[in-house]
């Protein structure tokens, strides 16, 4: 089992964690409807990459 030799100071601990922050989810704009949606996901209107792939209630 691994055991640390020396205690890591709060400064070094913070530097180690500095890249663990969350980033904003990348959004894409649907070319057909102009809606924003998560990348690689179907838009709320049922469009994906310019094509209708899911029937919605409005159809």
UniProtKB/Swiss-Prot annotation:
Keywords: Ribonucleoprotein, Ribosomal protein. Belongs to the bacterial ribosomal protein bL32 family. GO terms for biological process: translation. InterPro entries: Ribosomal_bL32 (IPR002677), Ribosomal_bL32_bact (IPR044957), Ribosomal_zn-bd (IPR011332). Residues 9-19, 49-59 have a biased composition (Basic residues). SUPFAM superfamilies: Zn-binding ribosomal proteins. It comes from Cupriavidus necator (strain ATCC 17699 / DSM 428 / KCTC 22496 / NCIMB 10442 / H16 / Stanier 337). This is Large ribosomal subunit protein bL32. It comes from the Bacteria. Residues 1-59 are annotated as: Disordered. GO terms for cellular component: large ribosomal subunit. GO terms for molecular function: structural constituent of ribosome. Pfam families: Ribosomal_L32p.
């Amino acid at each position: 089992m691994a055991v640390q030799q020396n205690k890591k100071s709060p400064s070094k601990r913070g530097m180690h964690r500095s890249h663990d922050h969350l980033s904003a989810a990348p959004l894409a704009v649907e070319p057909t409807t102009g809606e924003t949606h998560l990348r690689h996901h179907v838009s709320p209107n049922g469009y994906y990459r310019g094509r209708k792939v899911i029937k919605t209630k409005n159809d």
